[in-house]
């Protein structure tokens, strides 16, 4: 993972991010940790696919399932 991506993700720890997955699901949660494979741990997580909200609590997302990460504005 490039240092630019690491710096962006590092600045988002403890902030809410949205993640688009390969299976067309969209996940929103608070970023807790990440690694060099872009595996992410999130808490207070919600699946917001198809305008339905499902609470997931704490999850680990494998980096190879992530298509896009939407970072907060600040």
Residue ranges and their predicted role:
Residues 1-74:
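Conserved RNA-binding domains used in RNP assembly and mRNA/RNA metabolism
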